[in-house]
Amino acid sequence: MSKYKLIMLRHGEGAWNKENRFCSWVDQKLNSEGMEEARNCGKQLKALNFEFDLVFTSVLNRSIHTAWLILEELGQEWVPVESSWRLNERHYGALIGLNREQMALNHGEEQVRLWRRSYNVTPPPIEESHPYYQEIYNDRRYKVCDVPLDQLPRSESLKDVLERLLPYWNERIAPEVLRGKTILISAHGNSSRALLKHLEGISDEDIINITLPTGVPILLELDENLRAVGPHQFLGDQEAIQAAIKKVEDQGKVKQAKK
C-alpha cells in the first residue's frame, strides 16, 4: 500500500542538451526552452495541489534554477532548498563536451548507448589536459563538499552514481520522507535514473531501457519501507512525454542522412 509520495525530475533543457553534447559536471545554464519546461512543471504540480516542505537539488545551476522556477510557479518560493554534489549528473569523464551523434559515428551507436545508459560501463576518465578539467575542479563548490577534492570522481558508471547518491538518500532525504514531508528532487537524467533503480528495484540489465526527458515531473508512490508501489509515473501529456523520451534516445544515434 502506498504511504508516501515523492516527486523527482530531470532539470529543464540546457544549451548543451540542445547541441547534443555530454554536459555532465560542466555548469551549463537552462536555455529558454528549459526555463519554460520548468515553469510548465510547476504549473502541473500546482494543478495537482502539491505543497512541498523541502527541495533537494544538485550543486549545478540547471538543477537549482529548475527548482526555483517550479517553486515560483507554485508560489512556494519560501520552501527550503538544499543542494548536494551527490545529486549531480553522472561524471562522463573524457566524453564531457563531446557531441553524442559524432561519437556514434566514431565509435558506433551501441558503444554510445552503453556509455549513456548501461549500469556498469565507465567512460574513459577526464585528464588534466581536458578543456573542461580546470573549470570543474577549480570551482569553489567542489572545495566545500563532504569529501576531499582529490576523491571526487573523474568518471562514473551509473553504478558509481548510485553508490555516491545512496548515502545522501539514506541519511538526508529518506528520513524527511519518513517524517511525512512532501519532497521535490530536482536532479539530472542519471542521478534520477540511479535513484529510480534503487527505489523500484530495477535490474542492472533493465535500467538501460529507462530514459527520462527534461522538465517532466515524475511521481513515485512509496511504501513504509520506501520501496516503490508500482512503476514511476510521468505527469503530463503522455503523448508529448513519449515523443520527448524518443528525442532523448535518438541523441546517441546517427541521423539517417549521415549513415
Curated annotation (Swiss-Prot):
It comes from Homo sapiens (Human). Plays a major role in regulating hemoglobin oxygen affinity by controlling the levels of its allosteric effector 2,3-bisphosphoglycerate (2,3-BPG). Also exhibits mutase (EC 5.4.2.11) activity. PROSITE patterns: PG_MUTASE (PS00175). CDD domains: HP_PGM_like. This is Bisphosphoglycerate mutase. It is linked to Erythrocytosis, familial, 8: An autosomal recessive disorder characterized by elevated serum hemoglobin and hematocrit, and biphosphoglycerate mutase deficiency. ECYT8 affected individuals manifest hemolytic anemia and splenomegaly. The lineage of its organism: Eukaryota, Metazoa, Chordata, Craniata, Vertebrata. At alkaline pH BPGM favors the synthase reaction; however, at lower pH the phosphatase reaction is dominant. Inhibited by citrate. Belongs to the phosphoglycerate mutase family. BPG-dependent PGAM subfamily. The keyword Phosphoprotein applies. The gene is BPGM. The record marks 29, 46, 143, 181, 246-247, 253, 258-259 as: Not glycated. Glycation of Lys-159 in diabetic patients inactivates the enzyme. Homodimer.
